[in-house]
Amino acid sequence: MQDFPQDLKDGLNQIFLSDPTAKSMGVTSFDWAPGEASVRSMLTENFTNFLGVGHGGFLFSLGDIALSFASNSYGRKSLAMKVDVTYHRGVQVGDEVVASATEMSRSRRFASYQIELHVGDELVASATGLTFRTEDWHLGEETWPEDWKKAY
């Protein structure tokens, strides 16, 4: 992999920090590199269902945020086309959930990802995601080096 230009990495970091859904879900920290991302959030009562446990939509959305950061991490604007999630166990108020997305394959137009959500060492949900990679670039196409654009 080529060296990621630091000014562009900083710019993408600011874009990810501004994500309104991540903010509203209390995403407190995230890590990312090209093709991968990890985000974390603590389940609050606002995201429980009528049974008093974590709503599946909370887990789905947290996984989707990790997917969006991972798929946009090369600088190209990418959009989720399909996400298929399996819930393995419920989560409780106060649980810190970590969602990680890892790129499995990437072509010029599409990329696929494996997504895992954990509470501690326990897998609570897993998913696969397929994204569409547009021709548009975050921060303006002209800001990205030509060799980076050709490679990614």
Task: Kindly label every feature range from the protein language model.
Residues 1-152:
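Terminal targeting signals and extreme-terminal segments of soluble enzymes
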